[in-house]
């Protein structure tokens, strides 16, 4: 059985990237929460 995590930079960016977060209201909430917490990296 193969492992479930098969890394791909493109897929990672398309699902968890900054632009994707900015698209939806919920995603913007995620970014604002991370800003408030003081995260160094917000999206990908």
UniProtKB/Swiss-Prot annotation:
GO cellular component, one term: ribonucleoprotein complex
A matching Pfam family: Ribosomal_L34
GO-annotated molecular function: structural constituent of ribosome
Classification via InterPro entries: Ribosomal_bL34, Ribosomal_bL34_CS
Alphabetic keyword roster: Ribonucleoprotein, Ribosomal protein
NCBIfam families: rpmH_bact
Sequence similarity: Belongs to the bacterial ribosomal protein bL34 family.
Matching PANTHER family: LARGE RIBOSOMAL SUBUNIT PROTEIN BL34M, MITOCHONDRIAL RIBOSOMAL PROTEIN 34 FAMILY MEMBER
Protein name: Large ribosomal subunit protein bL34
Naturally occurring in which organism (per UniProt): Methylibium petroleiphilum (strain ATCC BAA-1232 / LMG 22953 / PM1)
Gene name of this polypeptide: rpmH
């Amino acid at each position: 059985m193969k492992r479930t995590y098969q890394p791909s930079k493109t897929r990672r960016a398309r699902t968890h990237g900054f632009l994707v977060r900015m698209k939806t209201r919920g995603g913007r909430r995620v970014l604002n929460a991370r800003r408030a917490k003081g995260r160094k990296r917000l999206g990908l």
